[in-house]
């Protein structure tokens, strides 16, 4: 066989009409070689191969084509079975153009699903098998059964319940949405256009915004009966309403004005277009989308119960000797030979150190340093908590200077962290680990606190075993039989014997003062002792202070742990806010976690969706694969497809991170097994994203040597290929699964001028009528996680304001990371940047920033006549909302290119690269000189172009103050959500200082009156100092003339 030519990924993205010569190896040993279209799918290629093979020797020895499957070597140098024969060759992207045909083995349906899951989650399922890890295998079996049972239950749902699963309602946050200054009026007449499924005839008639969908459908049926002169026999209860051109339905006992789609139509002055869909169509959809029957075998019988622990096991609590380990040696250690190597070890329960850390002796640097040293900890084995983790840090120290003046502090500064690793002391079945363990370590990242140990890091070994530094340790055999942590009944038995204490009135007052103290700073030792002593009082009178009590519990004393867990059994259920706090890393105990999840079960789907990002991040804190949070998220995702969609993408976007790839991959596998139809929808999105990445790489390369117009032409040429058009058309938007990305409008697609050349992709959808234009921005090379978090918080603020009847016309556009520095951003149509508006109304970039009339004139041109008053009101409300939001979140780097205005008048901010007060500096000087952006041209619009329209301005100030006051009332919610997001590892959200910014901006240590006074000072400062913003904008305009 001639030597093959390797095919890098770029090779497969060339024009489709080019064919590629492929080498084929048949099971009979026959070799064939002929050209095929890179655009052909594997099924077509197999037919071509069969046609040619019949003229070759030994053809009679072959079975039918369906008995064989192609294999290839993929781009990661692995052999891959290509079970899905609808995939195109250019999408398979084999490393060499060589396809080998092998006999199929095993269950084809099962293998096809496994192959599709592997492709979708970005990790081969065979990698999970090859780990031979009992915890992984048990988790997979348990979750597979859990998810398949959920799928079977879903298949039995009635049409209305199935509709709720597949197309959850999209409602405004509350019925009281008629906020001050908004233009919606209660009980307003509304014209709607309704057609019946399968018919092109449509009817337009008037209903009230207070009517429920059932009333609208009854009107439509009466109208149809009148027009066609037929008797009225059909019942409205047998129908539901679909929004035309969208995967969105209106149903339930909600007034029409509470549906987001109807609200958007009211605001934009458009007529809602709806389709009446019969229940039989919904049931047909359900049956078509049901999971295939369990593969061949009968419904799985429940596994036999785990045998009870044999009497030959030993209870941990019976072992009173100190805990010790042996440090044997290291390997693959890379450090300066002039230094010495040291290992530090510590025992942690969450953030709490259980005893003093211990350090090894110093040894000379070499690749395989040897210690053979016993490390003893100041804690008895019986006092080790169930979730204790052993943390190691390997670091180098410069040999101590010979000068007598050298101080300990100086020598500590010379510590050079190399790597860290963590290990749970108990396995997932509660057994104390023993024997030799090789810990593959993670490279250390310098920490501003100078901490060497990393207790919040993963307990998984670094999978990069070829190059990672490693430590070989030995956990001693402490008893003749396996040692187990006591079962819950034994713990409760010990905890029951807690003595009752007499509480004085003075102690009760002290307790109240400690627990009601603003801010949750560190308590003094005597305060901790008092809270613990009065724990029954805390349970009875301050149950929401459970977190405080858990933090003062001595987790290195098994009697106290037993008493705390006994108390937890009868603790009243917590409100959601307090339960969220318990998911933080500071509370690792599994019983505490289960209690928190029990309290979170009351979350509505909309509330869960609002906090989903944080809940996914705190999965990183979990010590074992099987935990209540994972089951809770899977359970809810399999009962609501929108939650399933976003759970999938939040997990999938981090599959490139080695420390979470195993956990996230296993959860993704379980979700896919519980929703095989949704898996196909997600695969379509994955294919589109793959094509967009290839397109973006091509554009980046081309734009280096070719002017933009020619590069744009080449981009369009590439997009017109059949493989691209097919992949990029007719898919649900990853940003919002109810949005259908129908036909890609190649001529309207372009790329932006910024460094990473983001793609601007436009879609049209005829069915959706005038609202059918949709745009997405594909970014490749930028981390969108901080933008997503900021937009999530702005959306949460919008919800909280609307619940109080204040609609500030915010625009929290969609933003979703989908992979390693890749993601999508929603295009807000009919909008422009302030920079462009100012530059287009000025002759010079230098004077543009000082043109106070530019914004108002632009709004006048877009909103003639009476529409201008409405546009100015929209501007006023949204400007108030973003002033408060950007101040509270400390959003920096604000200039005229990242503040935009919609033609309707709504102002909004984009690009959130800096937040929580991490402002840009230049030459050490802070460039952000104002609390938020409130320039004179904004005030000019708010005052309708009049210089002394103080009434309008005071109304604007009132909106700001009311918005700020509402956010303060929910201050703890923001603190908890940001605290949970520390698990994400964002550079600007890594320590308590970043959270402190929020406490300060919301003035959480002050009374409401003091806080409002504080905000007024900031408001006046923003107004007074707005000339500085103008100077910044002038500099920005001059350095980057934005005129297109």
UniProtKB/Swiss-Prot annotation:
Span of domain PI3K/PI4K catalytic: 745-1027
In-chain residues carrying the UniProt-annotated modification Phosphotyrosine: 524
Regulation: Activated by growth factors and cytokine receptors through a tyrosine-kinase-dependent mechanism. Activated by RAS. IC87114 inhibits lipid kinase activity and is selective in cells at doses up to 5-10 uM. IC87114 blocks T-cell receptor signaling in naive and memory T-cells and reduces cytokine production by memory T-cells.
An annotated GO BP: natural killer cell activation
Pathway: Phospholipid metabolism; phosphatidylinositol phosphate biosynthesis
Region (Catalytic loop): 890-898
Posttranslational modification: Autophosphorylation on Ser-1039 results in the almost complete inactivation of the lipid kinase activity.
Residues recorded as bearing Phosphoserine in the entry: 1039
Region called Activation loop, residue ranges: 909-935
Region (G-loop): 751-757
Localization (cell): Cytoplasm
Effect of residue 1021 to K: In IMD14A; results in gain of function causing enhanced membrane association and kinase activity
Catalytic reaction list: a 1,2-diacyl-sn-glycero-3-phospho-(1D-myo-inositol-4,5-bisphosphate) + ATP = a 1,2-diacyl-sn-glycero-3-phospho-(1D-myo-inositol-3,4,5-trisphosphate) + ADP + H(+); a 1,2-diacyl-sn-glycero-3-phospho-(1D-myo-inositol) + ATP = a 1,2-diacyl-sn-glycero-3-phospho-(1D-myo-inositol-3-phosphate) + ADP + H(+); 1-octadecanoyl-2-(5Z,8Z,11Z,14Z)-eicosatetraenoyl-sn-glycero-3-phospho-1D-myo-inositol 4,5-bisphosphate + ATP = 1-octadecanoyl-2-(5Z,8Z,11Z,14Z-eicosatetraenoyl)-sn-glycero-3-phospho-(1D-myo-inositol 3,4,5-triphosphate) + ADP + H(+)
Domain (PI3K-RBD): residue spans on this chain: 187-278
Domain PI3K-ABD, residue spans: 16-105
Record InterPro entries: ARM-type_fold (IPR016024), C2_domain_sf (IPR035892), Kinase-like_dom_sf (IPR011009), PI3/4_kinase_cat_dom (IPR000403), PI3/4_kinase_cat_sf (IPR036940), PI3/4_kinase_CS (IPR018936), PI3K-type_C2_dom (IPR002420), PI3K_ABD (IPR003113)
UniProt record similarity statement: Belongs to the PI3/PI4-kinase family.
Function: Phosphoinositide-3-kinase (PI3K) phosphorylates phosphatidylinositol (PI) and its phosphorylated derivatives at position 3 of the inositol ring to produce 3-phosphoinositides. Uses ATP and PtdIns(4,5)P2 (phosphatidylinositol 4,5-bisphosphate) to generate phosphatidylinositol 3,4,5-trisphosphate (PIP3). PIP3 plays a key role by recruiting PH domain-containing proteins to the membrane, including AKT1 and PDPK1, activating signaling cascades involved in cell growth, survival, proliferation, motility and morphology. Mediates immune responses.
This protein's name: Phosphatidylinositol 4,5-bisphosphate 3-kinase catalytic subunit delta isoform
Organism: Homo sapiens
Taxonomy of the source species: Eukaryota, Metazoa, Chordata, Craniata, Vertebrata
């Amino acid at each position: 066989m001639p030597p093959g030519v390797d095919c890098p990924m770029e090779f497969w993205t060339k024009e489709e009409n080019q064919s590629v010569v492929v080498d084929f190896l048949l099971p009979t040993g026959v070799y064939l070689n002929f050209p095929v279209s890179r655009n052909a799918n594997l099924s077509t290629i197999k037919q071509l191969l069969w046609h040619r093979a019949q003229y070759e020797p030994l053809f009679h020895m072959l079975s039918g084509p369906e008995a064989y499957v192609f294999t290839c070597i993929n781009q990661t140098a692995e052999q891959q079975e290509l079970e899905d024969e609808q995939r195109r060759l250019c999408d398979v992207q084999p490393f060499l153009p060589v396809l080998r045909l092998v006999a199929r083995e095993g269950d084809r349906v099962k293998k096809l699903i496994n192959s599709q899951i592997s492709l979708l989650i970005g990790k081969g399922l065979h990698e999970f098998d090859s780990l031979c890890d009992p915890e992984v295998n048990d988790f997979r079996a348990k979750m597979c059964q859990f998810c398949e049972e959920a799928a079977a239950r879903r298949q039995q749902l009635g049409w209305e319940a199935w509709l709720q699963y597949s197309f959850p309602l999209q409602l405004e946050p509350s019925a009281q949405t008629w906020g001050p200054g908004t233009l919606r009026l209660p009980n307003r007449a509304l014209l709607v256009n309704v057609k019946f499924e399968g018919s092109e005839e449509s009817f337009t008639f008037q209903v009230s915004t207070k009517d429920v969908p059932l009333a609208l459908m009854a009107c439509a049926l009466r109208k149809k009966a009148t027009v066609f002169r037929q008797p009225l026999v059909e019942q409205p209860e047998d129908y539901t309403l679909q929004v035309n051109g969208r995967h969105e339905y209106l149903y339930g006992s909600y007034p029409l004005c509470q549906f987001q789609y109807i609200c958007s139509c009211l605001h934009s002055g458009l007529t809602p277009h709806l389709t009446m869909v019969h229940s039989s169509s919904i049931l047909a959809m359900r049956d078509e989308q049901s999971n295939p029957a369990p593969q061949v075998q009968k419904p799985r019988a429940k596994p036999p119960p785990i045998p009870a622990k044999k009497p030959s096991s030993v209870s941990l609590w019976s072992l009173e000797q100190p805990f010790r380990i042996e440090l044997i040696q290291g390997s693959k250690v890379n450090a300066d030979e002039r230094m010495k190597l040291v290992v530090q070890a510590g025992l942690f329960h969450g953030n709490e150190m259980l005893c003093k850390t211990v350090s090894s002796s110093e040894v000379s640097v070499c690749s395989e340093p040897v210690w053979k040293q016993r490390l003893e900890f100041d804690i008895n084995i019986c006092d080790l908590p169930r979730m204790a983790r052993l943390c190691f840090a390997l670091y180098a120290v410069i040999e101590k200077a010979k000068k007598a003046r050298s101080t300990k502090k100086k020598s500590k500064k010379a510590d050079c962290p190399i790597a860290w690793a963590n290990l749970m002391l108990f396995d997932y079945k509660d057994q104390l680990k023993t024997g030799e363990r090789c810990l593959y370590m993670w490279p250390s990242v310098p920490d501003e606190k100078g901490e060497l140990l990393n207790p919040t890091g993963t307990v998984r070994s670094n999978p990069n075993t070829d190059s990672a530094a490693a430590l070989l340790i030995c956990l001693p055999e402490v008893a003749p039989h396996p040692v187990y942590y006591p079962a819950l009944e034994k713990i409760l038995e010990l905890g029951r014997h807690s003595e009752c204490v007499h509480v004085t009135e003075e102690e009760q007052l002290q307790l109240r003062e400690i627990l009601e103290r603003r801010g949750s700073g560190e308590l003094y030792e005597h305060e901790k002792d008092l809270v613990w002593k009065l724990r029954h009082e805390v349970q009875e009178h301050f149950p929401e202070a459970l977190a405080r009590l858990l933090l003062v519990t001595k987790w290195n004393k098994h009697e106290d742990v037993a008493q705390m867990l006994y108390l937890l059994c009868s603790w009243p259920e917590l409100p959601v806010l307090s339960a969220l706090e318990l998911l933080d890393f500071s509370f690792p105990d599994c019983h505490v976690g289960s209690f928190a999840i029990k309290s979170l079960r009351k979350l509505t789907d909309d509330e869960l969706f609002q906090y989903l990002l944080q809940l996914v991040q705190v999965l990183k804190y979990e010590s074992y694969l099987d935990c209540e949070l994972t089951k809770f998220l899977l359970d809810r995702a399999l009962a609501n497809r929108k939650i399933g969609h976003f759970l999938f993408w939040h997990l999938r976007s981090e599959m490139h991170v080695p420390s979470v790839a195993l956990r996230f991959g296993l959860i993704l596998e379980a979700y896919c097994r519980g929703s095989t139809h949704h898996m196909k929808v997600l695969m379509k999105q994955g294919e589109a994203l793959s094509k967009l990445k290839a397109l973006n790489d091509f554009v980046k390369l081309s734009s280096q040597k070719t002017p933009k117009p020619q590069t744009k032409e080449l981009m369009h040429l590439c997009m017109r290929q059949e493989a691209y058009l097919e992949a990029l058309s007719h898919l649900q938007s990853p940003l919002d699964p109810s949005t259908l990305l129908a036909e890609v409008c190649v001529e309207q697609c372009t790329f932006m001028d910024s460094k990473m050349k983001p793609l601007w992709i436009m879609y049209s959808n005829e069915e959706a009528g005038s609202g059918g234009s949709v745009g997405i921005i594909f970014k490749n090379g930028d981390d969108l996680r901080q933008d997503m978090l900021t937009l999530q918080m702005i959306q949460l603020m919008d919800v909280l304001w609307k619940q109080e009847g204040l609609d500030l016309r915010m625009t929290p556009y969609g933003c979703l990371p989908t992979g390693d520095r890749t993601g999508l951003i929603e295009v807000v149509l009919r909008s422009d940047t302030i920079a462009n508006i100012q530059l287009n109304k000025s002759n010079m970039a230098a004077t543009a920033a000082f043109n106070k009339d530019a914004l108002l004139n632009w709004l006048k041109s877009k909103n003639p006549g009476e529409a201008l008053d409405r546009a100015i009101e929209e501007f006023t409300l949204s400007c108030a909302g973003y002033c408060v939001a950007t101040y509270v979140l400390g959003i920096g780097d604000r200039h005229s290119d990242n503040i935009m205005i919609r033609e309707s008048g709504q102002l909004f901010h984009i690009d959130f690269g800096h937040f929580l007060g991490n402002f840009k500096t230049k030459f050490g000087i802070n460039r952000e000189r104002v609390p938020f952006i409130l320039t004179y041209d904004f005030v000019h619009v708010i005052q309708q172009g009049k210089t002394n329209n103080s009434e309008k301005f005071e109304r604007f100030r009132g909106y700001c103050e009311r918005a700020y006051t509402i956010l303060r009332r929910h201050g703890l919610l923001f603190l908890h959500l940001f605290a949970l997001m520390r698990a994400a590892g964002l550079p600007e959200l890594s320590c308590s200082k970043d959270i402190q910014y929020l406490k300060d901006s919301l003035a959480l240590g002050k009374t409401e009156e003091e806080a409002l006074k504080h905000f007024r000072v900031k408001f006046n400062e923003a107004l007074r100092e707005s000339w500085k913003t103008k100077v910044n904008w002038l500099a920005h305009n001059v350095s980057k003339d934005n005129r297109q």
